[in-house]
Every structure is written in structure tokens, then in C-alpha cells.
Amino acid sequence: LHSFPTRRSSDLKQAVKPEQFRKVYIPMFDLGEVEQAKSPLYDWRPQSTYIRRPPYWEGALAAPRTLANMRPLAILGDNITTDHLSPSNAILMDSAAGEYLHKMGVPEEDFNSYATHRGDHLTAQRATFANPKLYNEMVRRSDGTIKQGSKARVEPEGEVMRMWEAIETYMNRKQPLIIIAGADYGQGSSRDWAAKGVRLAGVEAIVAEGFERIHRTNLVGMGVLPLEFKPGVNRKTLKLDGTELYSVIGNIAPRSTLTLVIERATADGKEEILEVPVTCRLDTEEEVSVYEAGGVLQRFAQDFLEGQVA
């Protein structure tokens, strides 16, 4: 048996007509003479904090990667997650991203989360290592214990500052960077900004005891070279403290053995050079090709331009 329509549904059917919605919504998409697009290209808005012209063909990403004389941005332990690398929580006023948004005229109640600003690199890159739970082994108290927080130590001065200020300092110096880490680097939920952030900071290579699979792939896609310590070798056996300069030499090929050259001063002021064999974690020829192009976007642009010429 079919039930009879209620009085309310009958009234709605008589009062609400499709034409009412068409009258309101269709004109919203009709561009007038003033609004007609002058160009097929998107008109980037300089004040937007949500979508901004990507910088992936500019700055550090446009410069050649030398893999020479790199300074460590951080020396990290085991189980560093993508949330350490690029948190997605709410943006606080006293954070680097919060200060930037405030400067851009955004009220604090509209800061939103880091995740919502992924389309604006000027906001999102300030999330790099912005996790207050981070332990950067380069930042220690006077008793030698590691200080918790989004901190870094800028070398050669040895000055400790907030991570973003350290990144800015190195960016202004055009200083290539490296990250040293323990096992299971990059575990957790997949976040593209966990790789984008370090690359935009100027990180050219990451040496770890092991990588999470998806994050390693994302690093390759951003043109960051993943390197793996040989078994039994790590930041502790090498007694790394962050004052060193790092270079990588050798033929980059799938899982080839490269040499990590570490230069540091000894206690008596003499120079010491260590040559440490590491495994290149570009696992396939395709990954080598993507890395050599500068990343997956650069590789795509390269293939597109070559196709246009052909």
C-alpha cells in the first residue's frame, strides 16, 4: 500500500520550484563584460593564504644540487613521523605560521589548520619540523640532555633558534642542507608536505638507518636524495654532533654504494675527514631519472617540453 503525501510535502511541492534555484544559481556563473577572463591562466592573488603560485621551479629547487658542503638542519632519532616533519594541527598565534598569517591580516580565529593551507607554500613551509614534540639532537641543555621543541642550531655560529628562523637563515645564505636520522624515518600518514617542506628549506639529502616506503618515494619525487647507513653504522657510532660539513660523492645509480664525506674538527683543533659508505635509496632507474630531473614535476615538465619539440 502507498501512503498519501503529507500536507507539508504537498505544500513544498507547490511552493518550491526548480526555476527558483535556476534563477539564483545560473547567473552566478555568468561572467559579465568586466569579469570576462583576459587570460586562460589563473590570476594568482598575492594576498591569498590558501592558494599561491607554486615555487617548484624557483629558488632552491631551480638551483643545481651540489651535494657538497652541506650543513645538518637536524640530527634525529628513530621513528620520526610525518607529523614531526609537517604537522597538520591547528595553527597557533605564537608559531611561525601564526605570526605570518597575523602579518597577512588574518584574524586568529581564522588561522585554521596547517593542512588547510597546503596550497600556499609560504604558510605550509613554516610547518616544517614545527612539532613541539620534536627532539633535534643538535639542541641540548648544558647537562647534555636533548631539549624538546621546534628548535635548530645554526652553524658555524652554534646559535640555537626556532626551526623556521634557522631555515630562513640558511635560505638567505643559500646553504645546502642535510638531515641525519635513525630508523623508520618518515613513518605515519602520507603527507606530501613532509617531503616538500624539507626540499623548500634547501635539504638536498637525508641519511637515515631506514625509510618508510611511501615517504621515501615522496622524497625522490621532490628531488631529495635518500641515503641509508650500512648495518652497524649510525649517527651514534660516528659521534655526529652537527658541527660537521657533509658531501656525497660517487655514481648515483639504483641502490649503489656512495660515499658520505664528513669533515669535522677534532678536540685539538685539527681537521678530521671520515669517508662513510652509504646505500643510495633510489631503488629503480625510473627513480634515478626523476631525481636527476629535480623531482617528479620537473620530470613531467621536461617530458612535456620534449614532446612539444618533437
PLM regions: where:
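Short, small-residue-biased leader/transition segments that mark boundaries at the very start
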Residues: H2-S9
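Glycine/proline-enriched, intrinsically flexible loops and inter-domain linkers
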Residues: V24, R213-I214
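Autoprocessing domains of the Hint superfamily
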Residues: G188, E275-A310
